[in-house]
Amino acid sequence: MAVLDEVQSSDVLVITEFRPNKNADVICAHLEALGFSYQFRTVEEPKKNGVLVASKTPFEGSMDEALGDHSHRVAVAQFQGLKLFGCYFPQQKEKQKVFDYLIDACREGDSNVITGDINTGLHYADETGASFYCADALKALNDGDMPDAYRHLHGDKREFTWFSNAGNGFRIDHFMVSRLLLPRVEACHYDHAPRESKASDHSVMTLELEVSK
C-alpha cells in the first residue's frame, strides 16, 4: 500500500498485471479511500491478469472487441477531452496484434494517451542489445501519431524500468501522447524506489499533462 500512498496526489492511476483476487479488493478499497472513486477493470477472473484504471474524476471505461482474445489487455478510458489507453502487453510476437490495434485506434482524435507495461522498447536505446520483439512496431507508433513523452523531454537519456533474472535492464514502461498534446507535457519521469525495494518488479512512471490549455 505504500506505493499507492506515494502516488495519491495523481489524478489517474493505471495498474497493470492486475488480478481480481482478495488482495485486489483491498487495493481497490484503499484507492477509493485515497479519492480514486472511479474505477474500471478489464478482468473479473481471479486467475487472469489485466488492467485497472482508477481516477478521481469520472470517465467511461471499456474494452474493445477488436482485440479479440487480447481485449483484457487494453483498458480504454474516455475522459472529457482525453482518451487513455491503459495497456498490459502480451509476450513476444503476440504484441504485434496490440500494436496494430493502437496504431489504428490512435489515427482518430488528437487527444490520446497510451501508457502501461508495453513490454518492449527500442533496440540499443531501451536495452543494451537488440532482443526486443516488435521494436519496429513501437517505432512506427512513435514516429506516427503517438510520440514517446519520455524521449520528447529527455532525449537519449537511458533508464531501465524492469530487470531480468540475469540482471539485464530494459525500459518497457512508456507514455505516448498525440502530437498535439506534446506542448502540454510538463513532466515525464520514473520512480525506481518501488522496484529497488521489491514492492514491485517495475518502476513507477508518471506523466504530468496540462489539460486546460
Predicted regions and their residues:
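A short catalytic or substrate-binding loop motif that flags glycine-/basic-rich loops and adjacent residues
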Residues: 44-47, 67-71, 166-170, 197-201
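Metal-dependent phosphoesterases centered on the DNase I-like endonuclease/exonuclease/phosphatase
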Residues: 29, 33-35, 97-179
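Short, solvent-exposed loop/turn segments at secondary-structure junctions
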Residues: 19-21, 45-46, 59, 89-92, ...
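Active-site beta-strand/loop signature of hydrolases that rely on acidic residues for catalysis
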Residues: 4-23, 84, 105-126, 149, ...
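Surface polyanion/phosphate-binding segment centered on an Asp-His-Pro turn
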Residues: 191, 195-213
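Conserved beta strand-loop-helix elements of the APE1-like EEP
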Residues: 46-61, 79, 83, 165-184, ...
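Short secondary-structure junctions
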Residues: 35-41, 58-67, 145-152, 183-195
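Structured beta-strand-rich core segments of catalytic domains in phosphoester-bond hydrolases
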Residues: 18-91
